[in-house]
Amino acid sequence: MEGISIAKLLVIGALIVLLFGTNKLRSLGGDLGAAIKGFKKAMNDDQPAAKSSAQDEHPAAISETRPKE
């Protein structure tokens, strides 16, 4: 097993273009890019909210226990 050569990749790419067509591949690439961009935006928006909510929480008050008399 030699692995995948450049010639094999070109043949696979040509078959994909023949099966799906260039317009379908172009729209698929745009959709994939938009999905990745939306995912990154959601991750970046979520991180500051998590940090601020952790800072907003106040620790519970410390209670004192006294021995029974």
Curated annotation (Swiss-Prot):
One of its GO terms (biological process) is protein transport by the Tat complex. Residues 54-69 have a biased composition (Basic and acidic residues). This is Probable Sec-independent protein translocase protein TatE. It holds the Pfam family TatA_B_E. Belongs to the TatA/E family. TatE subfamily. PANTHER family: SEC-INDEPENDENT PROTEIN TRANSLOCASE PROTEIN TATA, SEC-INDEPENDENT PROTEIN TRANSLOCASE PROTEIN TATE. It comes from the Bacteria. It comes from Dickeya chrysanthemi (strain Ech1591) (Dickeya zeae (strain Ech1591)). Part of the twin-arginine translocation (Tat) system that transports large folded proteins containing a characteristic twin-arginine motif in their signal peptide across membranes. TatE shares overlapping functions with TatA. The chain crosses the membrane at residues 1-21. The keyword Membrane applies. It is found in: Cell inner membrane. HAMAP family: TatA_E, TatE. One of its GO terms (cellular component) is TAT protein transport complex. NCBIfam families: PRK01614.1, PRK03625.1, tatAE. It is a single-pass membrane protein.
